[in-house]
Amino acid sequence: MRGVEPDSLPVEELPIPVPDVPGADATARGLPRRVDLTLRQRMIVDSSAIADLALRTSIASLLSATMVPSIAGALRRSEAVAEQKQLRFYAELAAAKDPQVSFPSPQELPRVSSRPANPVAEWVAKGNVSNIRFRSNFQAVNPDMRDQCAGFVRNNVVHAQHWRHDDGPRPTLCLIHGFMGSAYLFNGLFFSLPWFYRCGYDVMLYTLPFHGRRAEKYSPFSGHGYFAHGMAGFAEAMAQAVHDFRSLLDYLEYTGVDRIALTGMSLGGYTSALIASVDDRIQAVIPNVPVVTPDRTVDEWFPANKVVALRDWIAGTDTELVEAATMYSSPLNYRPLPAKDRRLIIAGLGDRLAPPEQAEMLWEHWDRCTFHWFPGNHVLHVSQPDYLRRMTRFLAPFMFD
């Protein structure tokens, strides 16, 4: 098996060029204060934060459109009562803090079908790439949601892309994309996955529910279904994300893979942190610019925050009940399973979609594990070469002999 050279990633290896402005690991007190940054770092943080605000407003506008029907629902007394019942259901699950009850394991191996990916994917990877799919056997955790969740046609077919070496199985790096960012090609290039592949890893790119080919027919954008069905719909989407990924782990384990690392960005970072609290087959986990309290994050997302506030006001929603219910799918509600030295969190100081304070909350919950920051925003990962080298140094002892 080819060894990994932790510091060998040059800037020219990156398919998407970004400035190599170094970040650093957090100190014992957490992320750096503004005064601790160099002038160049402060300029990059400030400019990237402004760019993120524009992007955040655009995404929040899309989310607002998906949530408008919920305002009409709030006007109907029966739907408002049903939502309160659902909130209590997830709040009670969250209060138990038992990940095995909250996220039951798959009961059968997936029946996976595979076909070669397109030539562009194989050219990017410089290796064997296949697109795999299997039918999800997920059953909604909330009995009241089972008919609705079972009725999704495309969402209940799981999709992933697998990069494999001829002499496999190899240690596998799994990646979970962010909200609306499901394209395999984009993620492969953005995270420099061809370089990880050449370092000896097999790679698995997992598609979240309601994204990409899992988006239901007539969905206006990838990821629409995540927020289109109210809080209960979001909770079940997260439950299905965990369940279907565990089915993917079953498949990898069946094919002989015994070392799996997991990383994810944004919503994918949130999901990867949650999975690391549920399944002990994850050897190492790296949430990248994660959200950990989506309800608090959306509070800052204009105009979506106004739509949520209006809906809650009309329905007479109990704010404390909402906060308790949203903890159901938060990684802050469960203990991580990988050992402390196998957890690495990455945050962007200029991030205004998943503010660095979110990552810092996870860092505190995860016993102040390794925490790396870079001076960019949510999508412009300035110093990405630096944190990719950091990821490789972090992973090598666990993934390779």
Give residue ranges: language-model regions.
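N-terminal targeting or regulatory segments adjacent to alpha/beta-hydrolase or S9 domains
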Residues: 1-145, 152
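Proline/glycine-enriched tight loop/beta-turn segments at coil->beta junctions
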Residues: 152-158, 164-173
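Cap/lid segment of the alpha/beta-hydrolase catalytic domain
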Residues: 174-239
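Gly/Ala-rich beta-loop-alpha elbow adjacent to hydrolase catalytic centers
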Residues: 264-272
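Hydrolase active-site cap/lid region
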Residues: 274-320, 373
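Short beta-strand/loop motif that positions the catalytic acidic residue
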Residues: 338-339, 344-347, 351
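Conserved alpha/beta-hydrolase "acid-adjacent" motif
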Residues: 352-358, 383
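Catalytic histidine-centered segment of alpha/beta-hydrolase-like enzymes
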Residues: 376-389
